[in-house]
């Protein structure tokens, strides 16, 4: 099939939006919206502060669903765990281990509670420094002025003309012209009081050095890295968080590559799996089947289902009905099998 002609993707804009979402959930590695922003995928690292270390998934599920009033239950579902660079779909008896990277599908209204349940009670970002006033940094600053105006933002841009341009375009952002590695300039940006520094230049090596400067100033950092080899070395290099623009762009394209009623896709863990939002059509093989009886491939885990206007965590006996919207993790080897379940018959 040909790619739709109206598919226009701006990588810089998508990356800026991705970072802006991360700022709403400090501590998360990814915050990805699904179902018109009703659901979010969180990726978190299980650290020493997590109270759920050594807890089995069945116990975590029971903990999230312990309220007699179901509306108060935590609508969050662990879809996958990455351990020692291997992604797997956990069984109910599996336990969380320190260092695990977990992927959680959660109702957007329960993001803060979910973060807290996993030991992330970071204070909201109040002061932010952006190094690099290119398209990513500029678009991010614009979004923050519009959607998170309570955050104080400073941009350091090396090019004088570009500095003047973005200063003219932004109304509530401090724009400084100079080298992002200049300690005097960082002091002028008040790095000592900053909650986060973003290294968003178009040079990987510069961004890595900037992260080291941020660490020296006891400031958390997020950096953009285009070379995946650097991404693999982030722990050795002491980098706290890395944004990979290619991963974000690929995920936007995947929706249009898949067959069937696929609404959105996000690739995870070096494309070992995908998080998919798909709609059940009247011709689907899944209609009127319970979750446990559905023909889901082995490498697929259903996280949440939207039935009409209600979002639920499905049980084994949950019946799949027409127009249900299903959010699931699917390992790459089983993607084609999953596509078949959501295809219109005429597409076979």
Role assignments for model-derived ranges:
Residues 1-348:
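Cytosolic regulatory regions of ion transport systems
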């Amino acid at each position: 099939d040909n790619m739709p002609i109206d598919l226009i993707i701006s990588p810089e804009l998508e990356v800026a939006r991705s970072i802006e979402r991360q700022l709403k959930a400090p501590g998360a590695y990814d915050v990805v919206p699904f179902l018109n922003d009703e659901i979010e995928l969180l990726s978190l690292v299980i650290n020493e502060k997590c109270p759920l270390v050594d807890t089995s998934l069945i116990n975590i599920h029971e903990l999230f669903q312990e309220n007699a009033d179901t509306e108060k239950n935590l609508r969050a579902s662990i879809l996958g765990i990455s351990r020692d660079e291997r992604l797997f779909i956990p069984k109910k008896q599996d336990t969380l281990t320190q260092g695990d990277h977990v992927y959680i599908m959660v109702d957007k209204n329960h993001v803060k509670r979910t973060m807290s349940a996993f030991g992330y009670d970071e204070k909201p970002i109040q002061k932010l420094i952006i190094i690099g006033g290119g398209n990513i940094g500029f678009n991010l600053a614009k979004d923050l002025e519009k959607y998170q105006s309570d955050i104080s933002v400073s941009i350091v841009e090396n090019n004088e003309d570009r500095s003047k341009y973005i200063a003219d375009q932004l109304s509530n952002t401090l724009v400084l012209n100079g080298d992002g590695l200049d300690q005097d300039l960082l002091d002028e940006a008040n790095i000592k009081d900053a909650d986060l520094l973003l290294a968003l230049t178009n040079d990987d090596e510069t961004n890595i050095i900037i992260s080291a400067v941020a660490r020296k100033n006891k400031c958390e950092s997020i950096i953009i890295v285009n070379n995946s080899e650097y991404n693999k070395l982030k722990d050795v290099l002491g980098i706290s968080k890395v944004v990979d623009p290619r991963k974000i762009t690929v995920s936007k394209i995947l929706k249009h590559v898949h067959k069937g009623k696929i609404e959105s896709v996000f690739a995870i863990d070096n494309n070992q799996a995908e998080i998919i939002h798909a709609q059940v059509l009247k011709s689907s093989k899944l209609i009127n089947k319970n979750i446990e009886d559905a023909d889901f491939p082995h490498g697929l885990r259903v996280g949440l289902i939207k039935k009409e206007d209600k979002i639920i965590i499905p049980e084994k006996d949950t019946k799949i009905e027409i127009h249900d919207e299903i959010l699931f993790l699917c390992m790459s080897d089983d993607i084609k099998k999953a596509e078949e379940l959501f295809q219109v018959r005429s597409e076979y």
